[in-house]
Amino acid sequence: PVGWNLPMGSIHRKNHGDGFMLLGDAAGLVDPFTGEGIGNAMVAAKYAVRVAKKAHHLGEFNAKIFQEYDELVWEELGGELGTSAKLQKLARYSFLLNFVIKRAARSKDVQEIISGMLSNEIARDDLSNPSFYFKILLS
């Protein structure tokens, strides 16, 4: 079997043009840190339907009309995808990743913090903040 890499959401790719809007993996909306994409695809679908209805009403299906779709999607998902891209880069530092994992293995509080961030209950931005690691150090 031959496969291909999924386009991660760390880069804002063109997701529309004359007569089309791309959603989900095709639009590069895969979360760079978790690899999850279904939730982002559903967000994109919500906006694609809204913009497609507008385009149908106007009888225009050009890139200019579909630009609104791009703006809506990235307004909602851009910040989260950007943070996930930062986290992906942070994970390349094995000493930092090992430090967090070792702390999580010993501390229920750290486990809950990380779990909350991965489930979006706690802001992921905290993971890229040095104070987060200081907090873990003291846990």
Regions found by a protein language model. Give the residues of each.
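FAD/FMN-dependent oxidoreductases across multiple families
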Residues: 1-51, 57
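C-terminal helical "tail/cap" subdomain of flavin- and related membrane-associated enzymes
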Residues: 53-139
